Structure formats: structure tokens, C-alpha cells
Amino acid sequence: MAYNKSLKSLVFILLASQIVFVLFLCYGKSSRELGVKWNSDIRSWMTSYVGFNGETAAISEEQLIWAEKIPDYNEEIVVRLHLEEENNLSDILQKAQSQNLDIWDYNFDHVDLRLKEENFDFWKSQYRSDILINNLTETLFESIVPDTTNSPFSTEAFLQAVENGHLNHEMFTSFTDIFFKSYQNLESINSWLRLMASLYKDLSELVPVGITAEGRTILGLKLNGRHPSDNGEKIRNKKVIIIQGGSHAREWIGIPSVCYAAWQLLAKYDSDGHVRKLLDKFEWIFIPVLNVDGYEYTWSNDRLWSKNRQPLNNSECFGINLDANWAFGFNGNIDPCSNEYGGLSPFQANETMALFNLITESLSQEQKKVVGFLDVHSYSQSVLWPYAYTCDLFPPDTENFEELAIGLVKELHRVNSRYYTYQQACIPYDGFHKHYLPGTAIDWVYFAADVAWPFNIRLRDMGDYGYLLPAKQIVPTAKEFFAMILYYGEFIAEYAF
């Protein structure tokens, strides 16, 4: 009980660090010099959470439920099994699936598995292995603690500025930095998207992409540069780049990275010629959280949930793997309870159908063509291009993919000296046997939608934390990703037309 109490206390701290910014998001006006509605009722509500008298304040029922779910991972570990023989990968995957284990990552070199510590002997007796995470609960807890070091303003200073109507763009920028120093829940992310659309309404537009099985709206942010010669008229025939994150709910790091890239493009449009060129050249659509139901579930119930939350016919299990539900190399014969389950038919998931409609209907009606597509994931630090379904298919653009990928990994490395790999997304067992990744987004958009430059981007890390990357790594990762985005856009702009 003492351990559980300490967990709840840290959740209190996390909520306190976020709540001021959430209020700001909800009440920001649509101007660069912000004025914020404020009254005693709001301040009273704020105080009931933060506790200005120094005592721990009340916390939402959702946060309490989430805190009590953390001990569910007690005595669980994450291990890496090294592949030393040609049939190791298929053997390990079959055994893991038969035991209903959570497969975190796999490639031609290793397989990462989440399992009970008591079951580790079975695996290490058969394969050379290492323990990556020896205390899953502790590592999970580290991932949610916000990084509030070097905050330029105190909470009281921020509140005073809001109350006096003196909240300017500089202070907003500083608190946006704080927004990126901890993981945010879905409500905060959606409020942040609305704020961006309000602050930069001459450059951006909020886009409802679709509705999920649980009735939530998938929100995107559309970015365009200013074109004085067009007199504000809608630009037609513009090339589009789509960047999506959060298709797998537990891969949290991709979400703030996508948000950060969108913010930087908006904030630097007037001061950076390279950014201005990219917004003038392309229409950018950022979708930070495609799997909104699943992401919400990782905050309320199970931090390591991956699929969406769509009910399945004739199954007690929930959810579809959104990156296995596309109509290229689709496989509907996977166990519905598996994280790999891609549904009974392509586009069965509301989320993939929504993105399909965006690409094939909404944009085509505006005579716009998608030329770039980035599907942002974690972990493994890799840049991958089609085809994922099979290594027997070589895209005719392989040399171009490789040229661009080399530039992308150089940019990712340049920022913080992090090494990323690059390759075709299929995973070979060896020189003869192949592994198939069915129904992936990058395969469909490349083959069926004729998108020239689709990539699957897997951000930090290499397995030390896996899906539980600490909050202190959000900003460094996001900066790497933004540098990569700039190179990606410049490459397409200069060499693809």
C-alpha cells in the first residue's frame, strides 16, 4: 500500500504541472498577444487541483484509476533474445504467440519480449538473452514524471500574468516548452491543437479527420504558407505531406514529436526562410494521435495497450492493429486477441478508413495530391521504406528511398549524436526465408495511393526503455525529428519535381 501511495503522489505532481497549461489552452484567444478569460470560479477550480496551500489536492477519478493500474506490471520484465540461427525468429515468434506474450520488437538480429520474471528461465535456456528492463513498474513510473527543471516562470507568475491579462507570446512560448517536457493526455493534446489553429489561423486550420468506434474525433492540423498573390483564395493543386503519430497507442514518444514539428513550422515561418519555403511549397497535415481511443485507454487503464478499442464480432477481445489494417498484403487470419491482429478486412478500423477517406476523397476533391507520408512510431531508431509485406518486392524507387533515408538518418544523428538505421521495412530471416508484415500503411499509400515518399519512422530508443521512454527525452527526440522533417521536405521540394 505504501508503494501504491507513492505512485499516486507522483501522479498528483504530474497533474499539477499540466493543469495550468491545460487551462491556458482552453481559454486562449485567437491572437498572438493573448488575452485569457479569467474569474474566481476558474481560480477556485484550479486551486482545488494544485493546492496553493501546499497540501496535496483532489485528483480526478481517471487519474486514480490509472495510478492503481501501475502495479499490474509487478514482476514483469522485458528481455532481448538474440537470433543466432536461421530459424530462431520464426521459432521465437511462434512460441511467444502461443503463450500470448507481448512482443515488443523484432528484426533480423533480436526479439524483445515482455514476460513474467518467473518465466525467464524457459527462454534463457534456449536462446542467448539479456534483460532490458528488470522492473517494468519502475520504468513505467519514470516515463510519466515530468521534467520541470529550468522552468522560466513559476506557476504563480503564470497565474498572475493570466489574471492581469499580460500573457504575451514570449510567455506562451516558454510554457509551450513546458508542454513538451511531459507526456500529455488526449484532452490536453486536442486543446493544444485548437490553440495552434487559433494562434496561427493565417497559417493553420484544425481538421477533423474522422470519428472512432468510441465516438471520439481524430483531429489534425493543416498547415499552409501565406500566398499574397492568391488573395486568400484556397490554393488548388497543391502537393500534400501527411505526418501521423500514435497509431499504436503505447508508442507515446511519437505524439509530442509530431506536435513539436507542427509548432516549430508555425513559430518559425516568419523568421526562417527554409521553413517558409516548405510551408509555401506544400500543404502539411499533422495528425498527432490517429488511435485516439487506444491512447486514451493507455491513460485510464493499461499503459501498454497497443491496438484501437473497436469491439470485435464473435470475440471477447478488443481492438485492431491500425498498422495491419491496410489493403496491401492484408492478413485476416491472425488471432483477434493478438497485438498483431489487423481485423477481418482492410479498413475495418474506423481510424484507417478515416485516413483512407482523407487521402482518396477529401484531398482529391480539392485536386491535391499526397507526395509525402510519414508514419511515426517507437522504438528501434530506424527509418524504413516500402515494402514491409515482403522482401521479395523491390520498389522501383529503391535507390531514391535509400538516398533520402541516408540524409534523414544523418539529420537525426546531427542533433544529438543518436544513431539511426535505414532499410526496407521487410524483415528477412536470412538470405532465403522472409518475414511478412501484412497490411501496413506505408505499403498501401505507396502502391495504391501512389504516394512517392512514404516512410515508417521509429524514434527513440534502442530498447533500454522501449515504449516507456522517460519524459526527459521528449524534447531531445522531438528536436531530432524536426530536423529530419526539414530535410525531408527540402529533399522532396528540390529533387522530386
Curated annotation (Swiss-Prot):
**Species this protein is from:** Schizosaccharomyces pombe (strain 972 / ATCC 24843) (Fission yeast)
Q: Name one Pfam family in it.
A: Peptidase_M14
Q: Which residues participate in Zn(2+) binding?
A: 248, 251, 377
Query: How cofactor binds (record note)?
Result: Binds 1 zinc ion per subunit.
Q: What PROSITE patterns does this protein map onto?
A: CARBOXYPEPT_ZN_1, PEPTIDASE_M14
- What biological-process GO terms show up in the record? proteolysis
Assigned protein family = Belongs to the peptidase M14 family.
Q: Which gene encodes it?
A: ecm14
Task: Tell me which UniProt keywords the record has, alphabetically.
Answer: Disulfide bond, Endoplasmic reticulum, Metal-binding, Secreted, Signal, Zinc
Q: Provide GO CC annotations from the record.
A: endoplasmic reticulum; extracellular space
The cross-references to CDD domains, in alphabetical order and at most eight, read: M14_CP_A-B_like
**Record bears the keyword Disulfide bond:** yes
Molecular function in Gene Ontology: zinc ion binding
* Positions of the propeptide segment: 29-148
Domain of life of the native organism: Eukaryota
Q: Where is the signal peptide?
A: 1-28
Q: Give every Peptidase M14 domain span.
A: 182-492
The name of this protein is Inactive metallocarboxypeptidase ecm14
Q: Which cofactor does it need?
A: Zn(2+)
Show the disulfide pairing.
Answer: 317-337
The entry's localization annotation reads: Endoplasmic reticulum; Secreted
Q: What does this protein do?
A: Inactive carboxypeptidase that may play a role in cell wall organization and biogenesis.
Q: Which residues bind substrate?
A: 248-251, 323-324, 378-379
Q: Which InterPro entries match?
A: Peptidase_M14
